[in-house]
A protein has these predicted regions:
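GH16 jelly-roll
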Residues: 1-128
Length: 128
């Protein structure tokens, strides 16, 4: 749902799938950067349907990712978000790391200690 990296004034919504990560296909875009005050309480939301993932911050739509309904979906794995599949919702504060090519880069000791507080997580099934 959200990833916050290195005390930036933004969060990221990112789709991690075989299609976007392993095959490195970025069409449609698999990520969005959204400015928000990370020191405030923020409400992050995700609406998931068979056709689209829609992300929100504080009630405002900030990003969407559509199901391309590829003919070779079994191979490409662009849309693993089916009701029969399991997947992870990520709420992440990325401090950095030593892994080569790490998105967050090395850990900056000036940002330590770091705290991420989560007040609640709610999952609701929408009736159709």
């Amino acid at each position: 749902i959200m990833e916050h990296v290195k005390q930036e004034s933004a969060i990221h919504h990112t789709i991690h799938t075989h299609y976007t990560y392993d095959l490195n296909i970025k069409d449609p875009s698999n990520t969005a950067q959204v400015t928000c005050n990370y020191q405030d309480w923020n409400i992050y939301a995700l609406e998931w349907s068979e056709d689209k993932l829609t992300f929100f911050v504080n009630g405002q739509e900030t990003f969407s990712y559509s199901n391309l309904k590829l003919e070779n979906e079994a191979e490409m794995k662009q849309w693993p978000f089916t009701k029969d599949s399991s997947f992870y919702l990520i709420l992440n504060m990325g401090l950095g790391g030593d892994r080569e090519g790490s998105w967050a880069g090395p850990i900056d000791d000036a940002n330590l200690p770091a705290i991420m507080e989560i007040d609640w997580v709610k999952i609701t099934k929408l009736d159709k």
